[in-house]
C-alpha cells in the first residue's frame, strides 16, 4: 500500500493515503485489545468504514458493535472512540471532512495511554 505518511501510535498505526484542503483519507489499524482515546474534534467530521475485523464504537456514550462493510458517521464535536476486543486487528478507512485536519484538533476526554493535556 502506498501512503504519504505513516505514524505508529500506542493502539496501532495510521496511514495518510490522501490529503487535500477539504478532506483527508486515512487507513487506520487498531491492534487486538487496544482502543483509541475517547475524543472529539472541533473542526472536522469523520466517516469510518470497517474493512477488516469487528469493532466496538462509542459515540456520545452509545456503544454499538460494527463489522466489515459497516459505515459510521461521526459529526463534528461528537465524542467518539473505537476499540478492538478481538484477537485480530481492526482496519477502517477514515474520511475526514472539514476545514482543518491537524492532529492537534484531537480533544481527548479519556485515554488509556495518558495523553490527556
Where are these predicted regions, by residue range?
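Glycine- and acidic-residue-biased ligand/ion/polar-headgroup-sensing regions
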Residues: 43-56, 60-61
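Double-stranded beta-helix
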Residues: 2-8, 81, 85-117
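A short glycine-rich, His/Asp/Glu-containing loop-to-beta-strand
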Residues: 3-40, 44
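Short acidic-glycine-tyrosine-enriched beta hairpin
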Residues: 61-79
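Short beta-strand segments
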Residues: 36, 62-64, 105
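A generic "binding-loop/recognition-motif" signal
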Residues: 32-34, 43-44, 62, 78-79, ...
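Short beta-strand His + acidic residue motifs that chelate non-heme Fe in jelly-roll/DSBH
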Residues: 37-38, 57-58, 74, 80-87, ...
Amino acid at each position: 500500500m502506498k501512503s504519504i505518511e505513516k505514524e505508529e501510535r500506542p493502539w496501532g498505526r495510521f496511514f495518510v493515503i490522501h490529503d487535500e484542503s477539504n478532506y483527508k483519507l486515512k487507513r487506520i489499524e487498531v491492534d487486538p485489545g487496544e482502543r483509541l482515546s475517547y475524543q472529539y474534534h472541533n473542526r472536522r467530521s469523520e466517516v469510518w468504514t470497517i474493512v477488516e475485523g469487528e469493532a466496538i464504537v462509542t459515540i456520545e456514550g452509545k456503544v454499538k458493535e460494527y463489522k466489515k462493510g459497516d459505515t459510521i458517521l461521526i459529526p463534528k464535536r461528537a465524542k467518539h472512540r473505537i476499540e478492538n476486543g478481538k484477537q485480530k486487528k481492526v482496519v477502517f478507512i477514515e474520511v475526514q471532512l472539514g476545514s482543518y485536519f491537524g492532529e492537534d484538533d484531537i480533544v481527548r476526554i479519556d485515554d488509556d495511554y495518558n495523553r490527556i493535556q
